[in-house]
């Protein structure tokens, strides 16, 4: 049976960054790997960040959001059937940062997928700089995306103090308890380490972490009602202006509650990936990009967002 791994994590936690390392590690073991990248909204920006995986033999398939649950499940099912028929040995699924994992497990239980796929690992990425307070819907997503994890990886540990790392662990435990989930993570199940320092032994342990069955009390809401994505195409703004103005979006209540900003900008003939949360902004060079900026959050005001960006 094809092994299928799930890499979860809330918006901006660092799933795509870890996914690149994880999929490349499996390819280095001689395993034929395919990544199924699922982004929130109608434009899949994260897929462009995985271009370099093709160089190590990893194939990438994508599903864009922006549709109802039934349509999304149908698209995912179709992709998984196609990948199984193409002979991949391992499929790594990265859902969006706003994702009900029950939807994924429901798809895996359907015929013929239940005969072709076996759940391998569930890995949850949690930001070491996780905000102290989230909305009830965001708290539920944090808990439900982590409950089945065989291993939790704290991201951005190199930027966090020991107190912040402990605070992220406590926050996760609190979110799980609020959802009436019995899942508790022991010290050996949480890896708090700069990813640049991950060893081959670390990767082998992560790749064998498995999963734990757990359940959370369901919080019923429509992801696309609770969370929104706003797209800006061909803004024509410089990298310097975007880097200066994007951080202000997170503190401006008139913009709504901004959770993440991501996209691309060209500067001097070089494309850069912009990725921002309330904890900070990064700009990393990439081979190719497109003039798009996506803001994800709650109660967003597009006109106000654009006004702030163009200041």
List the model feature ranges, each with a label.
Residues 2-13, 17-135:
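Nucleotide-state-sensitive switch-loop elements of NTP-binding domains
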Residues 144, 148-154, 158-289, 300-303, ...:
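C-terminal accessory "lid"/substrate-recognition subdomains
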Residues 16-20, 139, 169, 243-246:
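Short amphipathic alpha-helical segment that frequently serves as the phosphate-/nucleotide-binding helix
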Residues 83, 98-184:
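Conserved C-terminal guanine-recognition region of P-loop GTPase G domains, centered on the G4
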Residues 80-84, 108, 137-140, 275-280, ...:
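A general structural signal for short secondary-structure boundary/capping elements
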């Amino acid at each position: 049976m094809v092994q299928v791994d799930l890499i979860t994590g809330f918006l901006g936690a660092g799933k795509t960054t870890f996914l690149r390392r994880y999929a490349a590690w499996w390819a280095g073991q001689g395993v034929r790997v395919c990544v199924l990248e699922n982004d929130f909204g109608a434009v899949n920006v994260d897929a462009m960040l995985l271009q370099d995986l093709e160089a190590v033999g990893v194939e990438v398939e994508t599903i864009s959001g922006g549709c109802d649950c039934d349509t999304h499940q149908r698209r995912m099912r179709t992709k998984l059937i196609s990948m199984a028929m193409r002979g991949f040995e391992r499929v790594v699924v990265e859902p969006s940062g706003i994702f009900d994992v029950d939807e994924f497990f429901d798809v895996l239980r359907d015929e013929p997928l239940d005969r072709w796929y076996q759940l391998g690992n569930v890995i949850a990425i949690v930001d070491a700089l996780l905000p102290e307070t989230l909305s009830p819907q965001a708290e539920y997503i944090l808990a439900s995306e982590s409950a089945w994890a065989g291993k939790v990886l704290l991201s951005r540990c190199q930027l966090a103090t020991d107190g912040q790392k402990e605070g992220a662990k406590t926050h996760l435990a609190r979110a799980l308890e609020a959802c009436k989930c019995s899942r508790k993570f022991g010290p050996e199940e949480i890896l708090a380490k700069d990813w640049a320092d991950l060893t081959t032994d670390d990767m082998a342990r992560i790749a064998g972490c498995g999963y734990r069955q757990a359940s959370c009390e369901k919080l019923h809401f429509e992801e696309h009602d609770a969370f929104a994505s706003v797209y800006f195409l061909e803004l024509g703004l410089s990298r310097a202006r975007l880097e200066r103005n994007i951080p202000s979006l997170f503190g401006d209540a008139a913009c709504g509650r901004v959770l993440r900003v991501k996209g691309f900008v060209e500067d001097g003939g070089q494309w850069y990936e912009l990725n921002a949360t309330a904890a900070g902004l990064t700009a990393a060079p990439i081979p190719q990009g497109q003039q798009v900026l996506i803001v994800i959050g709650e109660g967003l005001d597009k006109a106000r967002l654009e006004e702030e960006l163009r200041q």
